Structures are given as C-alpha cells and as structure tokens.
Regions:
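Conserved donor NDP-sugar-binding/catalytic core segment of glycosyltransferases
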Residues: 115-146, 228
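Short aromatic/hydrophobic "clamp" motif used to bind/position activated sugar donors
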Residues: 103
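Glycine-rich, basic loop-to-helix element that forms the pyrophosphate-binding segment
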Residues: 82-98, 170, 178
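Short, flexible, basic/aromatic active-site loop/helix in glycosyltransferases
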Residues: 134-135, 140, 151-172
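A recurrent flexible, glycine/aromatic-enriched loop bordering the glycosyltransferase active site
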Residues: 162-181, 198-199, 225
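Catalytic donor/gating beta->alpha subdomain of glycosyltransferases that bind UDP-sugars
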Residues: 133, 138-140, 194, 198-199, ...
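A conserved acidic beta->alpha catalytic loop
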Residues: 44, 61-69, 110
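Short, acidic, metal-binding catalytic loop of nucleotide-sugar glycosyltransferases
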Residues: 43-54
Length: 367
C-alpha cells in the first residue's frame, strides 16, 4: 500500500529553470482494469523519440482484478500499486516516486505519437509556463468517435490554435488529464491533485490552482494523443453523467471559490430555468386557441435544435463533407449529452446536501 501521506522524495532538487532544452520527464499512467488497452499505450510509449536517459514511465495500478499488472510487468517501466481509491491517489503516488523536471500524464486508453514528449517540452522552454495541454483525437474511425471530435462541445479537448493563458476558461479552454504535463515545482507549489475529487474535473481543478500561483498555461494543438472514445451512445452518456458528478462534487467542495464550480452552478441553474421555460411553452402550445399561435410557439421551442443543425450544416459545407447524417443526429446527441451532464451535477449536489443534512441530524441527536 502506498503511503497516505503526500510526500516528495528527499533530496530532490527543484528547478526554476530547466537545465537544458531537453529536461528530464516522468510519464505517469494511472490504471485500473486496463488490460484491454494498456499494452497498446505502453508500446507507443516505448517508441517515443526522446533521450531515454531523461525519460521514465511510471504506471500506477489501482487494485486491478484483470491482467493489467501482468501486462505492464513485461515492459521496462516502473509499476506501483495503489490501494487507495481514485485516479488522484494514483497520480499523486506516481508523482511522489518520479524524478522528472516535467511530469506528463496520459491514460491507459490512449496511444501517443513518437513526438509527444518533444512537443510538450518545447512549450516549457519559457520558465513561466506551469502546465501544457494538447488535443485528444479519436482513435477509432466510426460515427460516434467522429462525433466526439466534431461536436460543438467536443468530448475531449480540441484546440484550433496555440494559446498562452493566465487562467482557465470554461467550458473548453483548459487541458484534459490524458494529454497534459506540468512543471514539477508548479505541482509541488499547489500540493498535487486533490484526492477528495472524483468522477471528473480533478485535473481541471489542479490546473486552476497552478494558474493562481502566477504560472501560465499553454494550450497547443500540435501536442496530440489518440483516445479510444466511447463506442456506444449509452457509454458516452454515462461518461457525461460522471463528468457532471465530478463538477457537482467540486462545487460542493469549493463553493464559489473555483471558476469551474461557478460555471457548474451556472449550468445547473440555467438548465432548470430552461426546463421551466420549455414547460411553459408546451402548456401555451396545448392551450393556444389558434393554429398560428401554436406554430409560433412551436418554432420558439425548436430554436435550439434548429440552431445546432445550422451549425453542423455549415461545418459540413466548409469541410466539403457529404456526411449530412450528422446534421440531424449530432444536435440530438448534443442535447442528451448536456442533459446527462447537468443531471449528473444536480444529482451529486443533491446527494451532497442530503449527506450533510444526515450528518447534521446525527450530530444533533447525540447532543
């Protein structure tokens, strides 16, 4: 069992500037029951074009019950076991046992290109840069994977141009955990990942704290990994529901102190206001005395999906892509994804409130 105390190795030298243009890099891979995908990731990591004397790979296994550990042990990488639950406990354990000036993160369902680390380290040549994130593109060539990349709100991060920012900007201007890196001293400055966070928004919260320490953040579309997106609509909706739960938990823990928690609370509030407005419109349509009134009210109700259809029609036309199926289907998926996300956030917020009330009542009964 890894130590519960967050501690960095003694004698480790902190660097305010990298020693050369090729800093030492540690790649941290948290995994649990990843036997189906981890081998392909590790094979791609073995092909990385970077000085092997300055590169280490550390896989942190969270009590896998499949063949994950057996597969990982066949590769020349560090393998650690973490008994505490959660991605963040695994990530912190990997950080604690790493040596690199730059710490990169990816997941077991990703595949990285040979130039991944070179691209990442180039963005750290400015000592003010605390963290870097890049694009996560679909590994599979199927309809749902393409949707995940082409949606008006991509499932993963996709940046059109390189940006250097001083703060996170929801909903899209921040890195994702499967393709990001941070300077060691920046991670140490903020105390690592918050192990109380689960389900999602954990790396986002870390990046926000790093930026608040006056580090800058680089979003670079040339830093790319391939990700094995969800293969079914149900899996995608479950993923978005879990992301929403992560946002709800962050809002409970941080209140309005976090940019992300404020954004989540705004999303939940707007969602319920929209639902109320839709209910009123439906009532007015049903009770409308004239055909024209019903048509006008119905048109107002259909404005969001029609707007999305226009967006995807324009996207299809600009790309000279004849796949007009997406003009109809993508808006539908966008809407139910949004519902799943906000439902997850609302569920977690309500659950947290109920748990707090239960604890309070229990405490009062003991007085």
């Amino acid at each position: 069992m890894a130590s519960k105390e967050r501690r960095y190795p003694e004698g480790k030298k902190l660097v305010s500037e990298q020693s050369d243009l090729n800093p030492t890099v540690s790649i941290i891979v948290p995994v649990k029951n990843g036997a189906a995908t981890v081998q392909e990731l590790l094979e791609s990591l073995m092909q990385i074009d970077y000085d092997k004397n300055k590169l280490e790979v550390i896989v942190v296994d969270g009590n896998s019950t499949d063949d994950t550990q057996e597969i990982v042990s066949k590769f020349p990488v560090g393998l650690l076991k973490e008994e505490r639950p959660g991605l963040n406990a695994a990530r912190n354990t990997g950080i604690n046992h790493s040596k690199g000036e730059i710490i990169a993160f990816t997941d077991c369902d990703c595949v990285v290109p040979r130039n991944w680390i070179k691209r990442l380290t180039e963005d750290f040549r400015n000592p003010q840069v605390g963290c870097v994130g890049g694009n996560i593109l679909g590994y599979y060539d199927n309809f749902l994977s393409r949707y995940s990349d082409e949606s008006i709100l991509p499932v993963m991060r996709i940046f059109k141009k390189r940006k250097v920012l001083s703060s996170v900007k929801p909903p899209l201007q921040y890195p994702a955990g499967c393709n990001m890196a941070a300077r060691r001293e920046a991670i140490e400055d903020v105390g690592g990942y918050n192990e109380n966070l689960m389900y999602g928004f954990d790396e986002d919260e870390l990046v926000e704290r790093i930026c608040k320490k006056d580090y800058s953040m680089v979003l670079d579309p040339k830093v790319v990994v391939k990700h094995k997106h969800r293969l079914t609509l149900l899996e995608l909706l479950k993923q978005n529901f879990q992301y929403g739960r992560g946002g709800g938990l962050l809002s409970k823990l941080e209140g309005t102190n976090s940019t992300f928690s404020r954004w989540i609370l705004l999303c939940v509030s707007c969602f319920f206001l929209l639902c109320s407005a839709i209910a009123v419109l439906i009532f007015l349509i049903i009770s409308a005395g004239s055909f024209i009134s019903s048509v006008v009210l119905s048109a107002i109700l259909l404005l969001p999906p029609i707007g999305l259809m226009v967006f995807y029609l324009r996207q299809t036309f600009n790309e000279n892509n004849r796949g007009y199926k997406k003009v109809i289907v993508y808006p539908f998926i966008d809407i139910i994804r949004s519902i799943a996300f906000v439902s997850g956030a609302a569920y977690q917020l309500l659950r947290s409130v109920a748990k707090t009330e239960k604890v309070t009542q229990s405490g009062n009964s003991e007085i």
